[in-house]
Amino acid sequence: MQELEQAVNRSVRVIPQGEGRVTIEKDLSSEEMILNMGPQHPSTHGVLRLECKTDGEVVTEAEPYLGYLHRCFEKHAEVVDYPGIVPFVDRMDYLAAMNSEFAYCIAVEKLLDVEIPRRVEFMRVIVSELNRIASHLVAIGTYAIDLGAFTPFLFCFRDREHIMSLLEWASGARMLYNYIWIGGASFDFPPGFKERTAEFVNYFRPKALELQRLLTENEIFVKRTKGIGMMPPDVAVNYGWSGPMLRGSGVEWDLRKHDPYSIYPELDFKVCVPDGKHSDIGDSLSRHLVRAYEMVESLSMIEQCLDKMPDANGFDPRSAIAKRIRPKAGEVYGRAENPRGELGFYIVSDGKSTKPVRCKARSSCFVNLSAMKELSMGQLIPDLVAIIGSIDIVLGEVDR
């Protein structure tokens, strides 16, 4: 107690001014303090630890520490055959497992140089866009609850449940689907799936617009996110950002449009970038808006696929799948537009084994999180929650 009093006395100077008046000068300088957020913290969206250096309430540096969810995916991929890797891929970005399977199968099929049945291509895009909407609903709902808005969280998970039911009906699983296989799919759509999906599209379109209004017209939500975590477009490109993070900085880049795969070239959709009317381009609010706009675009793509998809007529989605996959010697990089950005797989084959020599995953979450120092510098400690939520990380993909 005595030491505290001495410290206070040293920081306060009383200067006599005459006539009984004095001037009190206070030394308000502060020392740098290190603050840990996580790995068990409600704002980190998983087992992430941020080591924050702070000057008072202002963050001067934030260093992310990773690896708490490391599960040796890339090493496992070297001892499992090509089809057996699909369930491991599911467990990377478990909120968008269909999209992860799609990216991996694109890479292997590129190495095999096989042609995919046209109906399967439409099936893949439908389930991937459904999963994209479900993933964005989790991102928006948890972002809202991070900032204190509970009602949008309930709305998001209410509507997400419809998608989970559709994907479970198609694949037999609610999350880790193992549905998109190399050369095809595990099952054809069940009877009535097309009609039920069309019903969902009609149901959810007004709900998606309602959700946009619920948050973007909320004064508190806007004040917590607008101008927070700014990222200029050139810096975003230099960091290797992709997906909603890059588009939130005003860069119009989407693999489905600019490096198209599957049947995306046949679909009419626009790349969502903020216009600057509701947000400062490059801030946390812009990244949120991109995800909100993308859900509406995904509905349009699903609708187009339902109209164009060939009829089943006894179709077997496993017809083009080889019993034993042994690609020719070579290497390949395949990528797809995941809800969080570009997910890519670099695969090396020796031409002899049914297992890859090397399978390297390019995680969009890992790349996006690498810019945490840039995003957090000069921000207040409470605003770190808004910044982390705007990145929309899944630690299963970051740590692998």
From Swiss-Prot:
Q: Which GO terms describe its molecular function?
A: NAD binding; NADH:ubiquinone reductase (non-electrogenic) activity; quinone binding
Q: Does the keyword Membrane apply?
A: yes
User: What are its GO cellular component terms?
Assistant: plasma membrane
**Reactions catalysed, as given in the entry:** a quinone + NADH + 5 H(+)(in) = a quinol + NAD(+) + 4 H(+)(out)
Pfam families linked:
Complex1_49kDa
Q: Which SUPFAM superfamilies match?
A: HydB/Nqo4-like
May I ask which residue range the UniProt record assigns to the signal sequence? none
Q: Which InterPro entries match?
A: NADH_Q_OxRdtase_suD, NDH1_su_D/H, NiFe-Hase_large
Where is this chain's protein located in or outside the cell?
Answer: Cell inner membrane
Q: What is the membrane topology listed in the Swiss-Prot or TrEMBL record? A: Peripheral membrane protein
Q: What is its EC number?
A: 7.1.1.-
Output the superkingdom of the source species: Bacteria
Q: Which UniProt keywords are present, listed alphabetically?
A: Cell inner membrane, Cell membrane, Membrane, NAD, Quinone, Translocase, Transport
Under the heading Gene3D superfamilies, the entry gives: Cytochrome-c3 Hydrogenase, chain B
Identify which top EC class this enzyme belongs to: translocase
Describe its assembly.
Answer: NDH-1 is composed of 14 different subunits. Subunits NuoB, C, D, E, F, and G constitute the peripheral sector of the complex.
The similarity comment for this entry is: Belongs to the complex I 49 kDa subunit family.
- Stored HAMAP family: NDH1_NuoD
- Name of the protein this chain belongs to: NADH-quinone oxidoreductase subunit D
This protein's encoding gene: nuoD
